[in-house]
Amino acid sequence: MANRRGGGQGQPPSVSPSPGSSGNLSDDRTCTHNICMVSDFFYPNMGGVESHIYQLSQCLIERGHKVITVTHAYGNRKGVRYLTNGLKVYYLPLRVMYNQSTATTLFHSLPLLRYIFVRERITIIHSHSSFSAMAHDALFHAKTMGLQTVFTDHSLFGFADVSSVLTNKLLTVSLCDTNHIICVSYTSKENTVLRAALNPEIVSVIPNAVDPTDFTPDPFRRHDSVITVVVVSRLVYRKGTDLLSGIIPELCQKYQELHFLIGGEGPKRIILEEVRERYQLHDRVQLLGALEHKDVRNVLVQGHIFLNTSLTEAFCMAIVEAASCGLQVVSTKVGGIPEVLPESLIILCEPSVKSLCDGLEKAIFQVKSGTLPAPENIHNVVKTFYTWRNVAERTEKVYERVSKETVLPMHKRLDRLISHCGPVTGYMFALLAVLSYLFLIFLQWMTPDSFIDVAIDATGPRRAWTHQWPRDKKRDENDKISQSR
């Protein structure tokens, strides 16, 4: 197995594979790390994973770490770009296979990733999302190169359908020799431990967060003559759009003052349009289409109630954003959602039309009777729950733990794959690990590490990026990042 040896500013560290050895891969700094975030999902495509990577990276940069991000090219966005505070992003020219995830053969990405890891003197690889093929590739190659690895799982999976079975098997292979795993809720942790057959001791729970300065209440934007229910989500099956199509006609018939404001785009939008047409609700059901992140708050503050109909969710950031804007939240009781907000701020329902209608009627009664807490009071409570600085601090502790661990040498890694992943999958990926190791040797022969120029650090202790934006101020970059839901 390869060892990572520290190098100076003028000399890149060597990543020479050595099958029988392992070593401490942390560099000569004890308090800061060179971190590479890897995922197929990043700006300009935006969602929960993308926002998590961006915000976490900004806070880690603020704490003195060097952070870069690696993702695939999005249209004309290729090569190297810099975001706020010098966050360096590599947009790799890899082919997208499905739903913004790249195709993988394990080998085609090794030359590019190896070059980046050596050039940037990376010590910790932090991959995100089970759906990202590039994240799994980076974990696999990092272990071949002798780098410490961390993986954050943002999703919940079942165990019965074919898609879940295949994804769970891939996750078992990727995580069996990963140093540490992070989940966004305790429900997500239980799910991941079962799916990947992991030791719970190497799995930590670190939730998502929101920037409370981006989601502040504005009661004057509400129309008190009506009661507005806001829905902001992708209009897909997993988000419960079919449930929403059953709720709208039932409650609109019962409450003439009830209006629905729906933001988001997806294949299930046609169902909502059919409901609006069938029941002649054009003046009471407004479909806004895809929203950018900078517009979400302006939509939320127009409502009294926020409705979430998700059928599965590891950690729902949307309900935290809505509560931060002072809305009463009504949500399905699935996945990690019951862990997100206290009972005083959320009405939990079963994922059925009847239960959600009952929950909404309870919230409507509170609005009519004036018993809801003031939006400003709700905001002041929520803003103390989840902050990105706290997430970064807890993630930093994971990095400290990981940096003191040794990477499995090749023979132990092969034993782990065979014993942990089953006789067929285990031997197959053990063979791939050996081939990847031989390919790495070939690449090092073709282009030795010493021939790869060391990049100037935009972030970290030796950062060349001089213009630092404080996180407690509004930044233009936030306006550039769009979050289509």
From Swiss-Prot:
Q: A single Gene Ontology molecular function, please?
A: phosphatidylinositol N-acetylglucosaminyltransferase activity
Query: Quick check: keyword Hydrolase in the entry?
Result: no
Which residue ranges are recorded for the region named Disordered? 1-26
Q: Which residues lie on this side of the membrane: Lumenal?
A: 444-485
List, alphabetically, the SUPFAM superfamilies matched.
UDP-Glycosyltransferase/glycogen phosphorylase
Biased composition, class Gly residues, residue ranges: 1-10
One GO biological process term: cellular response to leukemia inhibitory factor
UniProt feature, compositional bias: Low complexity = 11-23
Which residues are modified to Phosphoserine? 21
Show which residues sit on the Cytoplasmic side of the membrane. Answer: 1-422
Q: Which domain of life is it from?
A: Eukaryota
Q: Which UniProt keywords apply?
A: Endoplasmic reticulum, Glycosyltransferase, GPI-anchor biosynthesis, Lipid metabolism, Membrane, Phosphoprotein, Transferase, Transmembrane, Transmembrane helix
Q: What class of enzyme is it?
A: transferase
Kindly give the membrane topology term recorded for this protein: Single-pass membrane protein
State which Enzyme Commission number(s) the record gives. Answer: 2.4.1.198
Gene Ontology annotations for the cellular component aspect, listed alphabetically = endoplasmic reticulum membrane; glycosylphosphatidylinositol-N-acetylglucosaminyltransferase (GPI-GnT) complex
Compartmental location: Endoplasmic reticulum membrane
Query: Where this protein primarily resides, as one coarse class?
Result: endoplasmic reticulum
Catalyses which reaction(s): a 1,2-diacyl-sn-glycero-3-phospho-(1D-myo-inositol) + UDP-N-acetyl-alpha-D-glucosamine = a 6-(N-acetyl-alpha-D-glucosaminyl)-1-(1,2-diacyl-sn-glycero-3-phospho)-1D-myo-inositol + UDP + H(+)
The record's subunit annotation is: Component of the glycosylphosphatidylinositol-N-acetylglucosaminyltransferase (GPI-GnT) complex composed at least by PIGA, PIGC, PIGH, PIGP and PIGQ, DPM2. Interacts with PIGC, PIGH, PIGP, PIGQ and DPM2. The latter is not essential for activity. Interacts directly with PIGY; this interaction regulates glycosylphosphatidylinositol-N-acetylglucosaminyltransferase activity. Interacts with PIGQ.
Q: Supply the name of the protein.
A: Phosphatidylinositol N-acetylglucosaminyltransferase subunit A
- Lineage, broadest ranks: Eukaryota, Metazoa, Chordata, Craniata, Vertebrata
